[in-house]
Amino acid sequence: DYERAFAVTGTCQWSCIVGNLKKWKEGYVEINFEHEGRPEHLRAWIAENRGREHTVRFEWSAAMTFGQLLEYLGRIPIPPYLNRESEQIDYTRYQTVYSKFEGSVAAPTAGLHFTPELIGGMKARGFGFEEVTLHVGAGTFLPVKDEDAAKHPMHTEHFEVRRATIVALLAKPGAVTAVGTTSVRTLESLPALAWRIHTGVPIDGPGPVGQWELYDIPADYTGRDALEELLAYMDARGLDRIKAATQIMIAPLGYEFRIVRNIITNFHQPKSTLLLLVSAFAGEDWRRIYDYALSHDFRFLSYGDSSVLMR
């Protein structure tokens, strides 16, 4: 629960990707700072080395929550491939107009193109908008290093979908446009939860939606089947939202899209899981799309141009 995690005081542990790890010798690193006229400190040390990620323990003296500490000392975590320090304008520019909850290490950048005026105009023309929550994990920045993409271990991300959103998805079958790969991963994780219900497995029993869990679902189990099963499950328990975690990896390895029909997404860097997702959605056309973007000087990555992919 991110709200509780940010509300702790004094000490906590987080799973982190650590840059310049070789420079971190044994012991702790310390930041000394002033808060409300008093000298304070923040200390951090590696509690456990877990390969790509490390468990880092934080301890601080100031009378503030961990969330307040991050706001006070932290910087906007702009993507490392921008090769610059964060700037004051990033606090508004690197944020969607519809964001509500803290927890992501990156903004869903396809949504940066949407303004209140654009959303209002689209609603006036009959387009419906529904919101989902995905706390984007730091692993989204990790490149796919193995030649065999199937060997790339996916990170875990937590998500939340409201009952009203599931009702809206059922009302417009075949007309779902996901804004960003973040929304795609969230929506496409729902059939895995529904299949657990269908097969009598506790919805949260096995842990996060597994990296390849969706590939094992029978092809004739449709998105509508999944949404109806989830809705019945929620209504039977009086739930107004589903909270879960996912490690879903959408790649051109026979993935079957069940919920999403169209995607609005920026242009992604090579050797990324995001480009694998685009390839799985667009098929071999992804090369033609990216060749066109490159030859016409489209801007790539977070502050770049966007695209609308349709099936």
PLM features: residue spans?
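Surface-exposed, charge/polar-rich loops and edge strands
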Residues: 1-311
